[in-house]
Amino acid sequence: ELVKIVKEHGMSLEAEVGSIGGEEDGVVGMGECADPKECKMIADLGVDFLAAGIGNIHGKYPANWKGLSFETLAAVQELTGELPLVLHGGTGIPDDMIKKAIDLGVSKINVNTECQLVFAEATRKYIEAGKDLEGKGYDPRKLLKPGADAIVEKVKEKMILFGSDGKAE
């Protein structure tokens, strides 16, 4: 029913299958792997994107993280065909794992935590340097600019890693 409503309004729909680890919107998951057959069932409903749990985690990764399950990702890709796959919890995943996930069909990678972290760090440095006390440095446009600039630089870095740099029309 939701797929029909979304299509009628020219929107896209992304489904998340399996438990993505970490905390997102107050829900805590352990990072289990999705069942590829369940992913196929959800894909067959007509969703536009599929985010399958493959050991990924929202937020920061713990030191004892086991890594992504490429076996699960390959099985999901095989069963769902050309459906674009999404990797939630992309922050902190090593570059070689990101590239392998892309090779196995991931076409969207969420890295919001990474953007939040660089924003907070740059804003903190601005305040700790006392720049908010100089002239009108307290102006939100000035106060938040270092953080916004840090996000821009992080996104550029990720676009190169993800292979999307220079592809916009």
Question: Over which residues does each language-model region extend?
Answer:
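Metalloprotease/metallohydrolase-associated module, dominated by Zn2+-dependent proteases
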Residues: 145-147
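Active-site neighborhood of phospho(di)ester-bond hydrolases with catalytic His/Asp-centered motifs
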Residues: 85-87
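Acidic, glycine-enriched catalytic cores built around paired aspartates
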Residues: 151-153
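Short acidic/histidine-rich active-site segments
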Residues: 89-93, 111
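Charged interaction scaffolds used for protein-protein
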Residues: 141-143
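Active-site gating loops and adjacent loop-to-helix segments of metal-dependent hydrolytic enzymes
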Residues: 128-139
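Short, acidic/turn-prone active-site loops that include or flank metal/cofactor-
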Residues: 113-116
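Alpha/beta enzyme core
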Residues: 1-83, 95-109, 121-124, 129, ...
